[in-house]
């Protein structure tokens, strides 16, 4: 494990057996220099307490990447990202409160929005970006939904799946990639 200064480029770098943590990306969201280069919503994740979850997430993504192809749709991406988040939360025993605030109480509305707009199986990059890329907020729930809401919904679907597959080990979960089947087995539609 190495610490490094990356000139604000990469947060975590993984190469073979080396892990590099760019300390300059975790100086706290109020770090004055960040204001010159980043938007407030980007600075929110640049806190020291994000180092360990980010290390786990980057490691898992490097080991269990998504085989992205032309047929990959929003639910596949949500569940893949959600699976990584679910595992990290499970291993570290935490929940990102900032991400969850408002989501749990509005979960049904969020799901209805996705379904009503026929986005679940969307392959359009703009639709996918809406749910999966960092932004100040998502224009849903009166603009109060956090960015990356697709990842949060994906983690909720994975949690539903795991409730029905209590004997499934984390390693086995990470190796699963048939997201359409997992989605159907999750029972998540039955909020």
Identify the role of each PLM range.
Residues 1-101, 171, 175-176:
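Acidic/His-rich structured neighborhood in mature extracellular/periplasmic domains
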Residues 75, 79-191:
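A cross-kingdom marker for long, charged
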């Amino acid at each position: 494990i190495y610490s490094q200064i990356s000139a604000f480029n990469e947060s975590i770098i993984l190469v073979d057996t080396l892990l590099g943590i760019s300390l300059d990306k975790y100086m706290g969201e109020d770090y004055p220099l960040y204001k010159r280069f980043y938007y407030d919503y980007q600075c929110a994740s640049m806190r020291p307490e994000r180092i360990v979850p980010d290390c786990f997430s980057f490691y898992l993504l490097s080991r269990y990447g998504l085989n992205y192809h032309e047929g990959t749709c929003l639910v596949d991406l949500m569940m893949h990202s959600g699976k990584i988040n679910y595992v990290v939360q499970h291993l570290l025993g935490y929940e990102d409160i900032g991400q969850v605030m408002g989501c749990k109480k509005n979960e049904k509305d969020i799901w209805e929005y996705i379904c009503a707009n026929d986005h679940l199986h969307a392959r359009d990059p703009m639709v996918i970006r809406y749910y999966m890329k960092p932004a100040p907020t998502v224009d849903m729930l009166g603009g109060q939904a956090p960015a990356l809401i697709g990842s949060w919904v994906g983690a909720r679907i994975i949690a539903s799946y795991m409730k029905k597959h209590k004997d499934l080990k984390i390693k086995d979960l990470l190796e699963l990639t048939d997201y359409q089947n997992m989605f159907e087995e999750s029972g998540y539609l039955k909020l």
